[in-house]
Amino acid sequence: EIDTGRVIQQVKVPIEDTDNVGDVHDKLMLLGGKLVTETVDNIIAGTITAVEQDDMLAEGEVLRPAPKIFHDTCRIDWQDKTMKQIYDFIRGLSPYPAAWTELQNGDKTINVKVYEAVKISGDSSAWQIGTILSDDKSEIKVAVQDGFIGIKTLQVAGKKKMQVVDFMRGFKFAENARFC
């Protein structure tokens, strides 16, 4: 059940385009301690004015519980999502539980968690969605509807989390490798 009680104090934190959920957690953790101290001081001083949560919502906005996150919920949908949607999906699940995908590399299918990515603008229409473009040294780009997603940090099943440059030292993509 959602906490619908009155709000006695709050602080807003900007979420940068590069922040992942771990970064936001850390920002809130630092501010939370200060806010608790400040709130207790204001309660003691009698300067708190509680505000109903409904009064804080924009017109037509409704509080909804966050959905439960399951393993399948964390799978990257390369086919039906835009570059920004995929990028935000990865950020929203990093570092835990992490977005994941399947790598089809030749006749092998490997589960891969994606922890960090970047948006890369460009015309991706020449490639099937999910196609991996790599220089075999330091870059993994994935063709999506409206551009590319550059993978920066990943974890192959059974291995440790690593930067793409480290991953590429010991891995070779097959000719038609793709994420699906």
Identify the residue ranges that each predicted region occupies.
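Donor/substrate-binding cores of folate-linked one-carbon enzymes
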Residues: 1-65
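Internal anion-binding site segments
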Residues: 58-180
